[in-house]
C-alpha cells in the first residue's frame, strides 16, 4: 500500500525546471528576503565569534565569563523565536517584525561601537537586545517566503536563498 502511495505522490510532483529560477528571481520580494537573510546572518554570526574578546577587552569582563555572556544569545533564541513566530501567525505584520528586528541589530552594533560605553551591565543588556532581534527577524523572514513564492516553487526559492546566503 505504501509503495502505491509513494508512486502516486511522485507522479504529482513537478520536475525541476531552470525556468523556475528565472521566475523566482523576478519577484522583488524574493530579493528583499534574500538580501535581509545575508545581511542579518552576517551581522550576527561573525559578532558571536568575536564577542568574547569584546566582552573581555572593552567591558572588562573576566576571561571566564566573557564567553558565557555571548553564548546566552543562542539559548535565548530557542525560547523567543517560537513566541515571535506565534505572534506573527496571529497578528501578521511580518515586514514590521523584520524591520524592528533589523533596526535593533543595527542599534546594538552601533552602541557596542561607542568607546565610552564600557559598563558590563550595558554589555549584558545589549546582548539580550541582540538576542531578541535575533529571534524577531527569522521568525518572520522564513514564513514570509511562502507568501510571495508560488507553492510549486518553494523548494527552489529556499535553495536559492541559501545559495545567495552562502555567497554573501
Predicted segments, located by residue:
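Juxtamembrane intracellular "pre-TM" segments in multi-pass secondary transporters
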Residues: 2-34
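Extracytoplasmic gate region of multi-pass secondary transporters
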Residues: 27-78, 138, 142
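Helix-terminus/helix-capping segments at the ends of transmembrane helices and short amphipathic helices
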Residues: 52, 56, 88, 145-150
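Helix-to-loop junctions at the C-terminal end of transmembrane segments
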Residues: 80-93
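C-terminal transmembrane helical hairpin of 12-TM major facilitator-type secondary transporters
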Residues: 94-144
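A late C-terminal transmembrane helix in Major Facilitator Superfamily
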Residues: 151-168
Amino acid at each position: 500500500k505504501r509503495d502505491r502511495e509513494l508512486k502516486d505522490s511522485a507522479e504529482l510532483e513537478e520536475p525541476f525546471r531552470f525556468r523556475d529560477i528565472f521566475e523566482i528571481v523576478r519577484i522583488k520580494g524574493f530579493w528583499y528576503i534574500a538580501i535581509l537573510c545575508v545581511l542579518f546572518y552576517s551581522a550576527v554570526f561573525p559578532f558571536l565569534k568575536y564577542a568574547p574578546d569584546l566582552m573581555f577587552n572593552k567591558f572588562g569582563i573576566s576571561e571566564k565569563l566573557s564567553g558565557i555572556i555571548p553564548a546566552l544569545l543562542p539559548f535565548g533564541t530557542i525560547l523567543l523565536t517560537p513566541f515571535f513566530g506565534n505572534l506573527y501567525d496571529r497578528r501578521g505584520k511580518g515586514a514590521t517584525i523584520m524591520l524592528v528586528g533589523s533596526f535593533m541589530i543595527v542599534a546594538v552594533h552601533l552602541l557596542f561601537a561607542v568607546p565610552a560605553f564600557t559598563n558590563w551591565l550595558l554589555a549584558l543588556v545589549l546582548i539580550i537586545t541582540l538576542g531578541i532581534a535575533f529571534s524577531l527577524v527569522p521568525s518572520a523572514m522564513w514564513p514570509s517566503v511562502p507568501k510571495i513564492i508560488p507553492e510549486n516553487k518553494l523548494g527552489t526559492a529556499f535553495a536559492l536563498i541559501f545559495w545567495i546566503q552562502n555567497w554573501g
